[in-house]
C-alpha cells in the first residue's frame, strides 16, 4: 500500500466532474466512479473533505451576463452545488462510506449547517464531509470556498481535480498544442502568470496560509492515490520554489 503524505485533504470537484460525457446535468455512473476512487483513499486512512461546484447545472456568472441579477444568479448556483453534494453523498454511502453534507446555505432538511468544529470532528471519526453552498456569499466562486474550507479545517493539501486536464500549462493545451506542463509553481508565480488555476482570491488565500495545491486529472487511473501519496502527478503549487 502506498505511503500517505497528506493525512487530511480537501478535494475540489468541479460541476463538470459530475456530468461525464452527457454534457449537462449529472451522469450517475460517473459520480459512482468518483465515489469509488474516494473510497479507496478513505480506506487508506486519509481524512477527506470535499467542495463541489455546480457548473454542470448552473453558472451564476454566465446567467448574470444574460441579464439575471448577479446575486440571484449566484444563489441559484449555490443551490446547484447542493444537488451535486447530495448525489455524491448517496454514491459514497452506497460504497459503505459514512458521509455528512454541510451547507453554507440553510437547508436543514437535507444538510447540516456549516460548522467548522463539527466538520473537523466528523473527519476525525473517519467520515467524509461534503461542503455545499459555496461560501454562502454571492460573487464568491467555489474555488474560493475550497481554499477557505481547506484552511479552516487545517487540511494538508488542496486537491484541484480537473476533467481531462492533467495539470497547469503555459497556455490552454486544447487551443495551443505546443503548450507545456508545469510540474511545479509557487503561488506567486501562478498569480503573476495569470494561469487561471483558480481565481485570484482563492490563490491569495492559499498563498497567505502556505496551503499547497495539486492540480491533476481526476480521470487518470488511481490519480487520487498518487496525489495523497506525494507521487509526481499534475502540477504542484506551493510556497516553496
UniProtKB/Swiss-Prot annotation:
Subcellular location(s) of the protein: Cytoplasm
Source taxon at top rank: Bacteria
GO function term, MF aspect, one: UMP kinase activity
Record has Hydrolase as a keyword: no
Pathway as given in its UniProt record: Pyrimidine metabolism; CTP biosynthesis via de novo pathway; UDP from UMP (UMPK route): step 1/1
EC number: 2.7.4.22
Regulation: Allosterically activated by GTP. Inhibited by UTP.
UniProt GO BP: 'de novo' CTP biosynthetic process; UDP biosynthetic process
One cellular component term from this protein's GO annotations in UniProt: cytoplasm
Described purpose of this protein according to its UniProt entry: Catalyzes the reversible phosphorylation of UMP to UDP.
Subunit structure: Homohexamer.
Protein name, entry field: Uridylate kinase
Primary gene name: pyrH
Amino acid at each position: 500500500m502506498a505511503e500517505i503524505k497528506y493525512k487530511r485533504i480537501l478535494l475540489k470537484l468541479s460541476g463538470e466532474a459530475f456530468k461525464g460525457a452527457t454534457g449537462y446535468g449529472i451522469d450517475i455512473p460517473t459520480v459512482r466512479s468518483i465515489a469509488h476512487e474516494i473510497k479507496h483513499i478513505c480506506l487508506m486512512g486519509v481524512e477527506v473533505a470535499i467542495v463541489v461546484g455546480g457548473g454542470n447545472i448552473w453558472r451564476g456568472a454566465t446567467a448574470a451576463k444574460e441579464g439575471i441579477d448577479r446575486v440571484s444568479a449566484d444563489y441559484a448556483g449555490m443551490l446547484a452545488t447542493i444537488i451535486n453534494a447530495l448525489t455524491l453523498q448517496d454514491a459514497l454511502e452506497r460504497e459503505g462510506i459514512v458521509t455528512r453534507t454541510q451547507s453554507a446555505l440553510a437547508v436543514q432538511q437535507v444538510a447540516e449547517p456549516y460548522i467548522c468544529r463539527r466538520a473537523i470532528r466528523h473527519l476525525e471519526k473517519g467520515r467524509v464531509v461534503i461542503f455545499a453552498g459555496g461560501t454562502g456569499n454571492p460573487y464568491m466562486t467555489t474555488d474560493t470556498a475550497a481554499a477557505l474550507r481547506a484552511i479552516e479545517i487545517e487540511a494538508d493539501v488542496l486537491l484541484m481535480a480537473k476533467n481531462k486536464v492533467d495539470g497547469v500549462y503555459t497556455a490552454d493545451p486544447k487551443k495551443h498544442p505546443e503548450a507545456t506542463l508545469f510540474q511545479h509553481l509557487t503561488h506567486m508565480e501562478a498569480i503573476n502568470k495569470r494561469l487561471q488555476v483558480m481565481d485570484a482570491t482563492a490563490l491569495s488565500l492559499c498563498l497567505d496560509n502556505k496551503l499547497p495545491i495539486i492540480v491533476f486529472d481526476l480521470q487518470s487511473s488511481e490519480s487520487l492515490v498518487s496525489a495523497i501519496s506525494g507521487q509526481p502527478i499534475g502540477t504542484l503549487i506551493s510556497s516553496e520554489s
